UniProtKB/Swiss-Prot annotation:
This is Adenylosuccinate synthetase. Belongs to the adenylosuccinate synthetase family. IMP binds at residues 13-16, 38-41, 129, 143, 224, 239, 303. It comes from Nocardia farcinica (strain IFM 10152). Plays an important role in the de novo pathway of purine nucleotide biosynthesis. Catalyzes the first committed step in the biosynthesis of AMP from IMP.
């Protein structure tokens, strides 16, 4: 069975954990291929148990599934160990989790620099989570990063940390007026943490490709979303990695010809956390309604999410840049009880109608949504398990989103639970 990529098609927080959990029983492997603990996903099990994960793939909650933190991920050792301990305390078997030897480690100096930089920028800040993700990726690209495998060689680790702090301590002390970090203290801290995860380090590229050769099913799970991609997102208000489908091959070591399906996750309205343009953002009672009904609070940051109507311009763009074959539409139940449900079908920019993503940052900031209104529905749809059980207006809304997005909507979420899903097409079929 070829690999499947799971992509957030908006600004993240679309409900990717629910999709992974739904497919989990038919998967052998789940791979996280980019990002770090700057994003979170929530999974609600049939018994009502809720798990919030930030670094570990959500397949960890499905017995028998092997999970991989891939080479494209940046790993905070402390967060990894805390998350493992939290899962094990709730009797989750974590023995099947592997960690790529080539993933990069978030070091204490990355976190320190990230936090003080955001404070220094003031109202010009990008809105990072302050968890060291960006600085770690900077070191990776500059070829001065610390990789997971380095914890297996104390001499190499010490050399890398000493070289890094020779420069970074200058930045912390002379620019930000902060205390210098002691290289040996940093090394000792990381080596101490490594004692608890060294047995998980592996050549995950080899293991994943061998699994595909055996006919096993591999899900490549992205974090965040298309519009946060460092290349294809609303730059500079983006993350430091590639959540789009192209990043799945690079961040896992699986060749693109092994990928057969790209499953995009779309929320039936739009949300965003942090700074940056958001054409359909609502500042009225409807925005409050979506936030309250949808429980729109960031899993990782605890920050309230900005809410707006569905943006078909963004959805079309996500379909194109990811090669999305199928969509999983989430949170349709949140829209119940609205008399009318607007859909942004295009933008007005400087008096012109624009149906594709604007080319420049300035144009996107000036974009005003052009809405098409659909009739709403009052019924509680949380018990629907077939498309035909949905109210006629809800069915019409889904079909219109499918038409505007340019890919079929194969699954529909009608509640947070694993079983609260309508499957129109089998994405693993």
């Amino acid at each position: 069975m070829p690999a499947i990529v799971l992509i957030g098609a908006q600004w993240g927080d679309e409900g990717k954990g629910k999709a992974t959990d739904l497919l989990g029983g038919r998967l052998q492997w789940v791979v996280r291929y980019q990002g770090g603990n700057n994003a979170g996903h929530t999974v609600v099990l049939p018994n009502g148990d809720k798990f919030a994960l930030h670094l570990i793939p959500s397949g960890i909650l499905t017995p028998g599934v092997r999970n991989v933190i891939g080479n494209g991920v940046v790993v905070d050792p402390g967060v990894l160990l805390d998350e493992l301990a939290g899962l094990e305390a709730r009797d989750v078997d974590t023995s099947g989790l592997l960690l790529s030897a080539d993933a990069h480690l978030i070091m204490p100096y990355h976190v320190a620099i990230d936090k003080v930089t955001e404070r220094f920028l003031g109202n010009k800040k990008i809105g990072t989570t302050g968890r060291g993700i960006g600085p770690c990726y900077q070191d990776k690209v500059a070829r001065v990063g610390v990789r997971v495998a380095d914890v297996l060689d104390e001499k190499i680790l010490t050399q890398k940390v000493e070289a890094a702090l020779e420069f970074k301590n200058q930045v912390l002390v002379k620019i930000y007026n902060r205390r210098a970090l002691d290289p040996q203290q940093v090394v000792d801290e990381v080596l101490g943490q490594a004692e608890s995860f060294a047995h998980r380090i592996a050549d995950t590229r080899l293991q994943l490709n061998e699994a595909l050769e055996r006919g096993e099913t591999v899900l490549l799970e992205g974090s965040q979303g298309t519009l946060l991609d460092v290349d294809h997102g609303t730059y500079p208000y983006v993350t430091s990695s590639n959540p789009t489908s192209g990043g799945a091959a690079v961040g896992s070591g699986i060749g693109p010809n092994k990928i057969s399906t790209v499953l995009g996750i779309l929320k039936c309205y739009t949300t965003r956390v942090g700074s940056g343009p958001f054409p359909t953002e609502l500042f009225d009672q409807y925005g409050e309604f979506l936030a309250k009904q949808g429980g729109e609070v960031g899993v990782t940051t605890g920050r309230a999410r900005r809410c707006g109507w569905f943006d078909a311009v963004i959805a079309r763009y996500a379909t194109r840049v990811n090669g999305i074959t199928d969509y999983f539409l989430t949170k349709l139940d949140v829209l119940s009880s609205l008399e009318r449900v607007p859909i942004c079908v295009a933008y007005e920019i400087d008096g012109q109608r624009v149906e594709q993503m604007p080319t420049t940052q300035t144009e996107f900031h000036h974009a005003k949504p052009i809405y098409e209104e659909m009739p709403g529905w009052w019924e509680d749809i949380s018990a629907a398990r077939t498309f035909e059980e949905l109210p006629a207006n809800a069915q019409a809304y889904v079909r219109r989103l499918e038409e505007l997005s340019g890919a079929r909507i194969s699954c529909i979420g009608v509640g947070p639970g694993r079983d609260q899903t309508i499957v129109r097409h089998d994405v693993l079929g």
